[in-house]
UniProtKB/Swiss-Prot annotation:
N-glycosylated. Expressed by connecting tubule cells and intercalated cells of the collecting duct in kidney (at protein level). Its main location: membrane. Homotrimer. Residues 31-61, 115-125, 175-179, 241-251, 304, 362-395 are extracellular. It comes from Rattus norvegicus. This is Ammonium transporter Rh type C.
Length: 497
């Protein structure tokens, strides 16, 4: 069938309709929280607060900055490893996150911050909205290079909605704990994305296989995303925790788990290569698995060595998943997981949910202290008869709920995205920026040492400097006055490893 990827009419109209709708809904429902309102000075006087430093902004904003950088820079650049899809990886991630945070502020506001007919907006709302969008960024990794920006916006709309419902049931009705989002963010996002890409299976995707790989510089850009995520992940897992020991503990546990996953990733990556070399895909992704795996139990008394153990096993399983499980899923189950989110978010997310359940089930006053266990798990009041085993069961139910919501929601949304009018590219044009972006003409200059140049046929590399531009290039860069070696210019396609 003919694929129409011209979005000149559809994309602008969709973006404008969505943004105008956001303006109207914000105008009707959203108001500043008292701590962000000009009447804050009256509240300070009423509560006898002497300093503006008591405002929640000063406690939460540093964590928000870190989480925000992870969503827009970390996830965006992590997906730039594809040689011809860097514009789309960063640009479409930017688009989905910008729309997603607005819709998430509304959805989460209606469920969590709704008072007297209005959503009260504060910095805490911004953190929760970023968490919600992070789940969408995870799912984006599974369909990267295979869907249009129109499909991405539709997927974001539905996923944010489902995420909010799942999170509300898990945290408020089942009353599970999930500080770092192993279940709500990573497990839900991963299996939602995997289900969508399974429904959108492309039988002729092999025709685009030459672009579904990296080159040297694209792997370096992706590593920037990895480092942003790795550095800020302790803030991510602790951002929504209670102030004090709980938040402090969440950051420490995440820090340790991340460190352990780096060493085990390097070890396994070297072991499984015949010549003991490292695979950049493993280093970019599996080194982050410790942050995912420790998420649910991050604010619990996991102990420092327990956090290291979680990171240890997450790094191993994630690396093995990239090496062996991803090819199996694609060849046997028809799951085309572009970024391998099953290995970075899916498996570690399930591990995180199980670790949280076990840690909660075996918590005791000897470890937490009687007031500490009440504070950490909310025992008391209507939960006065709540036992640690009941909390452990709640954690397992929360994990199963996230999986069920992801699978059912992914199937429904997948069939919606499968409709032919969203401007998706054909199988042979996947993973290509030029389908949706104005891409500059590329003329890549390669210096070839003279001793090597003479070993090739002069019809390919002459002994004197020569510039061979692409057929469409109108301007040829000047040759350096005295090049140290023969100069040849070739098209980008010939540089693919």
């Amino acid at each position: 069938m003919a694929w129409n990827t011209n979005l000149r009419g559809r994309l602008p109209i969709t973006c404008l309709i969505l943004q105008v709708t956001m303006v109207v809904l914000f105008g009707v429902f959203v108001r500043y929280d008292i701590q962000a309102d000009a009447h804050w000075w009256l509240e300070k006087k009423r509560k006898n607060i002497s300093s503006d430093v008591e405002n929640e902004f000063y406690y939460r904003y540093p964590s928000f900055e870190d989480v925000h950088a992870m969503v827009f820079v970390g996830f965006g650049f992590l997906m730039t490893y594809l040689q011809r899809y860097g514009f789309s990886a960063v640009g479409f991630n930017f688009l989905l996150a910008a729309f997603g945070i607005q819709w998430a502020l509304l959805m989460q506001g209606w469920f969590h911050f709704f008072e007297e007919g209005h959503i009260l907006l504060s910095v805490e709302n911004l953190i929760q909205a970023d968490f919600c969008v992070a789940s969408t960024c995870v799912a984006f990794g599974a369909v990267l290079g295979k869907i249009s920006p129109m499909q991405l916006l539709i997927m974001t709309f539905f996923q944010v909605t489902l995420f909010t419902v799942n999170e509300f049931i898990l945290l408020n009705l089942i009353e599970a704990k999930d500080a770092g989002g192993s279940m709500t963010i990573h497990t839900f996002g991963a299996y939602f994305g995997l289900t969508v890409t399974w429904i959108l299976y492309r039988k002729n995707l092999e025709q685009s296989k030459q672009r579904q790989s990296s080159v040297y510089h694209s792997d370096l850009f992706a590593m920037i995303g990895t480092l942003f995520l790795w550095i800020y992940w302790p803030s991510f897992n602790s951002a929504s925790s209670f102030h004090g020991d709980t938040q402090h503990r969440a950051a420490l546990n995440t820090y340790l788990s991340l460190a352990a996953s780096v060493l085990t990733t390097v070890a396994v990556s070297s072991v499984i290569h015949k010549k003991g070399k490292l695979d950049m895909v493993h280093i970019q992704n599996a080194t982050l698995a410790g942050g995912v795996g420790v998420g649910t139990a991050a604010e619990m008394m996991l102990t420092p060595y327990g956090a290291l153990i979680v990171g240890f096993f997450c790094g191993i399983l994630s690396t093995l998943g990239f090496a062996y499980l991803s090819p199996f899923l694609e060849s046997r189950l028809r799951i085309q997981d572009t970024c391998g989110i099953h290995n970075l978010h899916g498996i570690p997310g399930i591990i995180g949910g199980i670790v949280g359940a076990v840690t909660a089930a075996y918590s005791s006053p000897d470890v937490y202290g009687e007031p500490g266990i009440v504070h950490s798990f909310g025992f008391g009041g209507y939960k006065a008869d709540w036992t640690k085993r009941m909390q452990g069961r709640s954690q397992i139910f929360g994990l199963l709920l996230s999986l069920a919501m992801a699978l059912v929601g992914g199937i429904i949304v997948g069939f919606i995205l499968k409709l032919p009018f969203w401007g998706q590219a054909s199988d042979e044009n996947c993973f290509e920026d030029a389908i949706y972006w104005e891409v500059p003409e590329e003329v890549n200059t390669v210096y070839i040492p003279e001793d090597l140049a003479h070993k090739h046929s002069t019809s390919l590399v002459p002994a004197i400097p020569l510039v061979l531009s692409t057929p469409s290039a109108s301007i040829v860069p000047p040759v350096p006055p005295t090049p140290p070696a023969s100069l040849a210019t070739v098209t980008s396609s010939s540089l693919v490893h």
